[in-house]
Amino acid sequence: IAQCLVGSEMCIRDRVIVTYNRKAMLQRCLRALCTQTAGVPELWVVDNASTDGTAELVAQLNLPTMHYYNTGKNLGGAGGFACGIQQAACSGAEYLWIMDDDCLPEPDALQQLLQADAELDGQYGWLSSRALAPDGKDQPMNLQRSTPYKDLASFAGPRQPAVMASFVSLFLRSSTVQRFGLPIAEFFIWSDDWEYTRRISRSMPCYVIPASRVVHAMQNATVVNIATDTPDRWPRYRYFYRNDVVLYRREGLRGWLWLIAKDAWHSVQVLRRGPQKCERLGIIWRGFFAGVNFHPTVQGLPTQER
């Protein structure tokens, strides 16, 4: 495990990247990591069985601090992050820095997170960076939530309390993973990051660190909504509507009411626009009822490897 000097203290921290058929984007991400003022972290690249030459790229780069793990099949973002977090946490890392392969951290992004960790004396569940679009505006897909129902209103000050965040630059301690377990791999895609961060924020204060900034160069930068998305992406929405049931039913009656209102509003939007209304309505409500009967297990770290 690589060790780096940050301030006057030694720390062991690993960075987990999940990738799937985005070789060029992964290369940009790794290049951005090499410019970190806090030093280059130990890298765990989890490849969801890419077919675009990602494995060959990693071999060519031959970075001494990089560990490459091919899952053998596409586990989705949820499965990939669960796998990578387990690998890194069990390796002995004290800190984990999690992000997608299309996330480009600014040079001091990690330094700002480590500084916040020191100021808080480790008394937090997770820290989240401010995510920007390539044009410099805030990335709408990655706005943190101040409550389960409300986006963060401001990035003022050194930190802002939050209860949900995406896996686009999330920073936490391995001890937190040991306490709360891993992301739910069965989610496959969507809401795995919100479920995981909310699971933690129920018990520990969590924060957005506005000075830690990353660019999320995602291909589809719109808010998740089947009413406005392209037809080729409709089938994957079954995971979104199913997984949100698991997330929001934990909030009690208010969570159920919010969930039903959200899905009903999406249904109204579908009826107002575009073709194949019945198909999209079916995806929404089949996903909802699948979620009612969906009770995935939260996996912890293997006891023998802690």
Language-model-detected regions and their locations in the chain:
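A conserved acidic beta->alpha catalytic loop
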Residues: A32, D47-E56, K73, C103-L104
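A short, conserved alpha-helix in the catalytic core of glycosyltransferases
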Residues: L170, T176-G181, E186-S212
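Short beta-strand-to-loop acidic/aromatic patch adjacent to the donor-nucleotide binding site
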Residues: A93-D102
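Short, acidic, metal-binding catalytic loop of nucleotide-sugar glycosyltransferases
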Residues: R31-V40
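Glycine-rich, basic loop-to-helix element that forms the pyrophosphate-binding segment
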Residues: I1, T71-S91
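Conserved donor NDP-sugar-binding/catalytic core segment of glycosyltransferases
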Residues: D108-M141
